[in-house]
């Protein structure tokens, strides 16, 4: 039975946030991994997940190449740092990669078919892609309309193909979530990405490579999101 609204009462707006998963994850696994965060944000923001376009052929990649504890059913990624082996390592410098056309088209399709969105969130490789999307938005790319970005365990892509996206300071309002004991994406790697944003909000937590959602972090999430609810 539907709830009855009080006459004249203003309905509270809930932010819609497009969420990009990490390497070797997918829509379903990231939905499960963000369960605690979605609970903390209930009534303020809804997360909408979707899968990256590239299938990862080898789920047993070398340590440090991807995100641990992911469901292996349809492991996916946004791009490969080594196109010949269809693999990705955030610490691998590469002159070429699998390209951004497919992932950007996938995200643009999500904006078109699932949007509109108030913000965009990314985890690990997804956060690296979010940073690039922020740069494209700033340059006037008409496919991406949003007001803020949340980057969890983000890093700067080491592919020379992506270097152009870091040439100008990124002015999109951003919250960067960094794990002090993250052994997959070190805090130093995340801080390097932060340096490319103007006036970033930084949330440090004592944990590792995951999306934190305990009470202390909730306060920071809320304060950041509330700026866009007015």
Swiss-Prot record:
Catalytic activity annotation: a carboxylic ester + H2O = an alcohol + a carboxylate + H(+)
Family annotation (InterPro entries): AB_hydrolase_fold (IPR029058), FSH-like_dom (IPR005645), LovG (IPR050593)
Keywords: Hydrolase, Serine esterase
Domain of life: Eukaryota
UniProt GO molecular function: hydrolase activity
Transmembrane parts of this sequence: none
Active site: 124, 182, 209
EC number: 3.1.1.1
Family the UniProt entry places it in: Belongs to the LovG family.
Role summary: Exhibits ester hydrolase activity with a strong preference for long-chain alkyl ester substrates and high selectivity against a variety of short, branched, and substituted esters. Is able to hydrolyze ester bonds within a wide range of p-nitrophenyl derivatives (C2-C14) in vitro, with a strong preference toward substrates of >8 carbons.
Record-linked PANTHER family: ESTERASE OVCA2
Name of the featured protein: Esterase OVCA2
Native source species: Xenopus tropicalis (Western clawed frog)
Gene name of the encoded protein: ovca2
């Amino acid at each position: 039975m539907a709830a009855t609204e009080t006459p004249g009462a203003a309905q509270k707006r809930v932010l819609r946030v497009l969420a990009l998963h990490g390497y070797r994850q997918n829509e379903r696994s990231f939905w499960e991994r963000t369960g605690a965060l979605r609970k903390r944000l209930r009534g303020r923001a809804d997360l909408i997940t979707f899968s990256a376009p590239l299938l990862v052929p080898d789920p047993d990649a070398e340590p440090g190449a991807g995100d641990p504890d992911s469901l292996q059913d349809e492991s996916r990624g946004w791009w490969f740092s080594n196109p010949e082996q269809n693999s990705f390592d955030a610490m691998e410098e590469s002159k070429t990669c699998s390209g951004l056309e497919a992932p950007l088209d996938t995200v643009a399709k999500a904006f078109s078919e699932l949007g509109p969105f108030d913000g965009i969130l990314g985890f690990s490789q997804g956060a690296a892609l979010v940073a690039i999307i922020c740069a494209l938005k700033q340059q006037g790319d008409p496919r991406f309309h949003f007001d803020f970005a949340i980057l969890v365990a983000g890093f700067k892509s080491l592919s020379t193909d992506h270097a152009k996206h870091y040439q100008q300071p990124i002015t999109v309002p951003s919250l960067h979530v960094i794990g002090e004991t993250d052994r997959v994406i070190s805090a130093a790697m995340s801080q390097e990405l932060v340096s490319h944003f103007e006036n970033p909000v930084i949330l440090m937590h004592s944990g590792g490579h995951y999306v934190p959602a305990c009470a202390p972090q909730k306060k920071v999430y809320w304060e950041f999101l509330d700026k866009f609810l007015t």
